């Protein structure tokens, strides 16, 4: 009897107790499709010569069906364990929210809210009022506005302040970020006319002054957060641009990308200016993201002088890019943590990960490994290694953060197979392969990730 002939038929699988329980909880077509998928996998393994006798046991086959049902009924967008060591991982949703912020979002989502209702006056209010005062308090700006992402913030500002006019920007600041988002394209879409000055590596104050004409509407500075130009370089600083703008009667705008509200240099993380620095030197409009170094939800934040922010609130484009209530709840909750810097550093996950010391990471790795060892079979072996993490999110492209890595080895499973199978689990576990081993970075592992990793490794080793 060949191994193909021992693969069970559909009817026999449907009669198994575990599969009957699945039929009681799920539509029959869903379970039937899972059975056929499991059988296809068994036949493929038989053809490859990797199918084992124990894989054909009733419990093993039913387990496959159960996992396939779980996979097919799971939401497409779901929680993932980030073991990559990239803190602001764009593909994994960037910044996780603080626990109390998650609770605020849940409370707002549960029922109705005062999104656009003034509870004091009993009349229509503005959704932006929930965060404007907070943003002004935290940044020192006169006015603030929020939209759904920073690209939209830049587009809105350019459309409202420089539509049909020239915008002067250094050639070395014409950046492209992920998803082919390019500053020149956004300027064109906003109706602004790009006027490049300087060279890729050197731009001077005189370049801006010489480029100004009667058609000039705005001076733009773009922070090159996702790349670095080193060597023979020169750039015009924000204070210098403000001086030029005041001299020539032109507004100055800065797109600073990540938008950090806390100076992280004391933690060895240098090179990213704070929002407050740009506001304090007189930049008229500053735009930045909510889900990068700020550690909140995806949002585009605009702060600056009232004379230039208020026109944005009346622009027709704002309606198309306005922020929704759940994002607004998450953003307000995150911003409130920043009223106490110590609280923000302790509770905002992104900040907590970025500022973790080497000793904290070693301890975190030891504790995580201890929990894993209690839950996985002996065929799973764990070891700690020194390594480096990355900030991610287009910030600090040259910075490497020392970290502790957890190396995972499973008998009979190659690192490549492990990586592929772990990211297909009910709760996907995403790590990286380096030095011929599958690695999880302690910096980006959350405390409650352990049960999901244990479950995944147990299934992998079975």
UniProtKB/Swiss-Prot annotation:
It catalyses: L-seryl-tRNA(Sec) + selenophosphate + H(+) = L-selenocysteinyl-tRNA(Sec) + phosphate. The keyword Transferase applies. Its main location: cytoplasm. It is found in: Cytoplasm. GO terms for biological process: conversion of seryl-tRNAsec to selenocys-tRNAsec; selenocysteine incorporation. Coiled coil: none annotated. One of its GO terms (molecular function) is L-seryl-tRNA(Sec) selenium transferase activity. Its cofactor is pyridoxal 5'-phosphate. Pathway: Aminoacyl-tRNA biosynthesis; selenocysteinyl-tRNA(Sec) biosynthesis; selenocysteinyl-tRNA(Sec) from L-seryl-tRNA(Sec) (bacterial route): step 1/1. GO terms for cellular component: cytoplasm. It holds the Pfam family SelA. InterPro entries: PyrdxlP-dep_Trfase (IPR015424), PyrdxlP-dep_Trfase_major (IPR015421), SelA-like (IPR018319), SelA_trans (IPR004534), SelA_trans_N_dom (IPR025862). Keywords: Cytoplasm, Protein biosynthesis, Pyridoxal phosphate, Selenium, Transferase. The modification N6-(pyridoxal phosphate)lysine is found at residue 292. SUPFAM superfamilies: PLP-dependent transferases. HAMAP family: SelA. This is L-seryl-tRNA(Sec) selenium transferase. The gene is selA.
């Amino acid at each position: 009897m060949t191994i193909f002939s021992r693969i069970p038929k559909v009817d026999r699988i449907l009669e198994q107790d575990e599969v009957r329980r699945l039929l009681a909880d799920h539509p029959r077509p869903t379970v039937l499709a899972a059975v056929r998928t499991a059988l296809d996998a068994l036949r493929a393994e038989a053809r490859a010569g990797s199918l084992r006798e124990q894989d054909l046991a009733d419990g093993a086959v039913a387990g496959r069906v159960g996992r396939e049902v779980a996979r097919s009924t799971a939401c497409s967008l779901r929680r993932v364990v980030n073991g990559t060591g990239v803190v602001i991982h764009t593909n994994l949703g960037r910044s996780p929210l603080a626990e109390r912020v998650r609770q605020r979002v849940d409370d707002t989502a549960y029922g109705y809210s005062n999104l656009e209702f003034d509870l004091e006056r009993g009349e229509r209010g503005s959704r932006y009022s929930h965060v404007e005062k907070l943003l002004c308090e935290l940044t020192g700006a006169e006015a603030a506005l929020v939209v759904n992402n920073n690209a939209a913030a830049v587009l809105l500002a350019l459309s409202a302040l420089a539509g049909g006019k020239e915008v002067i920007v250094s050639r070395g600041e014409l950046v492209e970020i992920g998803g082919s988002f390019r500053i020149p394209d956004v300027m064109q879409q906003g109706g602004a006319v790009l006027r490049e000055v300087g060279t890729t590596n050197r731009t001077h104050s005189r370049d801006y002054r010489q480029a100004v004409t009667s058609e000039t509407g705005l001076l733009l500075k773009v922070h090159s957060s996702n790349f670095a130009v080193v060597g023979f370089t020169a750039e015009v600083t924000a204070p210098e641009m403000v001086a030029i703008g005041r001299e020539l009667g032109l507004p100055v705008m800065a797109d600073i990308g990540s938008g950090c509200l806390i100076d992280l240099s004391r933690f060895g993380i240098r090179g990213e200016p704070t929002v407050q620095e740009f506001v304090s030197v007189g930049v008229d409009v500053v735009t930045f993201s909510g889900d990068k170094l700020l550690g909140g939800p995806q949002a585009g934040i605009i702060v600056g002088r009232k004379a230039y922010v208020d026109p944005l609130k009346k622009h027709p484009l704002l309606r198309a890019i306005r922020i929704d209530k759940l994002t607004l709840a998450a953003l307000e909750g995150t911003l409130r943590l920043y009223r106490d810097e110590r609280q923000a550093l302790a509770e905002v996950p992104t900040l907590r990960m970025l500022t973790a010391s080497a000793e904290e990471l070693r301890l975190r790795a030891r504790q995580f490994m201890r929990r894993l060892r209690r839950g996985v079979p002996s065929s799973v072996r764990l070891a700690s290694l020194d390594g480096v993490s990355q900030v991610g999110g287009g910030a600090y492209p040259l910075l490497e953060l020392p970290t502790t890595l957890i190396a995972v080895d499973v008998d009979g499973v190659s690192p490549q197979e492990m990586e592929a199978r772990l990211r297909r689990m009910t709760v996907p576990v995403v790590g990286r392969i380096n030095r011929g081993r599958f690695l999880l970075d302690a910096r980006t592992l959350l405390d409650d990730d352990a049960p999901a990793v244990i479950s995944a490794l147990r299934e992998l080793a079975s």
